[in-house]
């Protein structure tokens, strides 16, 4: 049984005060979650404060991005070593906003994957197609290319620590979300692809999340699909009650989530 995973991506939101309040509320609301693993990914500037609040909690700390180099003349960047030192256990990589707004390439994302793994953290590789690519029938082609490039050169041991997230670009921050059936179709394809790229064993154990306008009212319908192992939550993760509800509903297929 793959334990559902729920990740809150706070994006570029949160003053120190807001971040502390949100982290404390999430911690208090998920003291003893059963049947679900929960991660929050705040902005870099509030990682220390949030990490302090989550110390010893059932909710893990993650980051939204990193650089692939250990250190150097990379103005404005943050290395995986720095994130590990702050207590991060997870890092989002290849998010659609990084790919499309900041023009990150598959090669750069692959280098970041290696850096995150070297520092003992777990990477979440995001893949997904744009609205135009979907209209042209290229969904499978796009996500296959992103997966193969992102995982290139990684050992079986490394791949066992990786998580995938399918995030259709047309459903991110738009209020339009893929139906459970649409999401399940791509997740099923990705799981089959993992079997081809890596192994049948990994295909059975790798967790594949869905991200794209996830809210409390659609999380359970999504995670009830057999190949959807949790959700990557954007805007809805900024409201503690809704995020807590999403986490508990996502745990439904593994049994009730208790506080």
Report each predicted region and the residues it spans.
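Active-site loop-to-helix "anion-binding N-cap" substructures in soluble metabolic enzymes
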Residues: 1-259
């Amino acid at each position: 049984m793959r334990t559902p995973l729920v990740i809150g991506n706070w994006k570029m939101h949160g003053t120190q005060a807001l971040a502390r309040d949100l982290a404390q509320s999430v911690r208090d609301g998920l003291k003893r979650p059963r049947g679900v693993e929960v991660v929050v990914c705040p902005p870099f500037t509030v990682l220390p404060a949030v990490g302090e609040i989550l110390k010893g909690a059932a909710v893990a700390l993650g980051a939204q991005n990193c650089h692939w180099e250990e250190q150097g003349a990379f103005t404005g960047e943050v290395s995986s070593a720095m994130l590990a030192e702050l207590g991060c256990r997870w890092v989002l990589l290849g998010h659609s906003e990084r790919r499309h707004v900041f023009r990150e390439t598959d090669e750069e994302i692959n280098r970041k994957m290696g850096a995150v793994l070297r520092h003992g953290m777990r990477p979440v590789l995001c893949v997904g197609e744009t609205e135009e690519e979907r209209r042209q029938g290229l969904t499978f082609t796009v996500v296959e290319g992103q997966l193969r490039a992102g995982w290139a050169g990684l050992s079986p041991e490394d791949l066992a620590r990786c998580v995938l997230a399918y995030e259709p670009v047309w459903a991110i921050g738009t209020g339009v979300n893929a139906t459970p059936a649409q999401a399940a179709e791509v997740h099923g394809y990705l799981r089959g692809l993992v079997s081809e790229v890596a192994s049948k064993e990994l295909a059975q154990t790798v967790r594949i999340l869905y991200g794209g306008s996830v809210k409390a009212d659609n999380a359970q319908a999504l995670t009830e699909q057999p190949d959807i192992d949790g959700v990557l939550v954007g805007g809805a993760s900024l409201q503690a009650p809704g995020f807590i509800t999403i986490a508990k509903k996502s745990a439904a297929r593994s049994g009730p989530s208790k506080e």
